[in-house]
Amino acid sequence: MALKTFKPVTPSLRQLVLVDRRELYKGKPVKALTEGKSSSGGRNNLGRITVRFRGGGHKRVLRNVDFKRRDQLGVAATVERIEYDPNRTAFIALINFPDGKQSYILAPQRLQPGDKVVAGESVDIKPGNAGPVGSMPVGTIVHNVELKIGKGGAIARSAGNYAQIVGRDQGYVTLRLNSGEQRLVHGQCFASVGAVSNPDHMNISLGKAGRNRWLGKRPHNRGVAMNPVDHPHGGGEGRTSGGRNPVTPWGVPTKGKKTRSNKRTDVFILSSRHNRKK
């Protein structure tokens, strides 16, 4: 889809760049596939802020997207329409099965209403089909890749994202991710063919602070602009540089310090995404 720019009738329209969504369905989502979504404002069950700079924003309805694709194996479904989803950057597709059941899936690029999609052990390599990564040829572009068999897709789910199959060995498949990381995934893990829709999402410009507030994002304050009680960089008469290496509000070094602690899955990462920065 193309990008939309606007005549600078107001200051905020001057910088505004949006994705043209005129081809998407304009009605409401399927009620049976939705549920209410209450906003947390970044607070936990004790009411304490666990994620800063969140709150407000437009009320949303949660669409139940099928990330597993294992319900009706071998049954071809028809794409009824492509929809906007406020809860993610990608678009979603409503698919109809022959028995009348409906489902939402992540819409890949080049998927159109009327197309047929199928999930199964051995599927054609066309956008929207899903199957085990071990049955797909080397070089295939995939998205919505499972890390654990049957748990549902976890890798490459946001707008324009994808992973590429670069090898197979002893029941495992080697994937190259957009970050540059290469990792092993079990060959029985499901993945969907193609790259995720809405690749132009990276080019949008919101044009004004209020448009970020509509998304539920509050102003992000710098540590050096705070008081010493609020941040390690706070305080000082006039403008100061912080006086120490950059840290988070909790004193953990930022800008490059490794924080990964899951050693159990280190064996599956063949090449770290940090290697290409050196």
Curated annotation (Swiss-Prot):
Q: Does the keyword Iron-sulfur apply?
A: no
**Alphabetical list of InterPro entries matching this protein:** NA-bd_OB-fold, Rib_uL2_dom2, Ribosomal_uL2, Ribosomal_uL2_bac/org-type, Ribosomal_uL2_C, Ribosomal_uL2_CS, Ribosomal_uL2_dom3, Ribosomal_uL2_RNA-bd_dom
Gene3D superfamilies, from UniProt?
A: 2.30.30.30, Nucleic acid-binding proteins (2.40.50.140), Ribosomal protein L2, domain 3 (4.10.950.10)
Chain residue ranges for the region called Disordered: 222-264
Q: Which UniProt keywords apply?
A: Ribonucleoprotein, Ribosomal protein, RNA-binding, rRNA-binding
Q: Which GO terms describe its molecular function?
A: rRNA binding; structural constituent of ribosome; transferase activity
* Gene Ontology CC entries for this record: large ribosomal subunit
UniProt keyword Membrane, yes or no:
no
Biological process according to GO: cytoplasmic translation
Q: Pfam families annotated for this entry?
A: Ribosomal_L2, Ribosomal_L2_C
Q: Subunit arrangement?
A: Part of the 50S ribosomal subunit. Forms a bridge to the 30S subunit in the 70S ribosome.
Q: Which family does it belong to?
A: Belongs to the universal ribosomal protein uL2 family.
Q: Which HAMAP family match?
A: Ribosomal_uL2_B
State its role.
One of the primary rRNA binding proteins. Required for association of the 30S and 50S subunits to form the 70S ribosome, for tRNA binding and peptide bond formation. It has been suggested to have peptidyltransferase activity; this is somewhat controversial. Makes several contacts with the 16S rRNA in the 70S ribosome.
Q: Mind telling me what this protein is named?
A: Large ribosomal subunit protein uL2
Q: Which organism is it from?
A: Methylobacterium radiotolerans (strain ATCC 27329 / DSM 1819 / JCM 2831 / NBRC 15690 / NCIMB 10815 / 0-1)
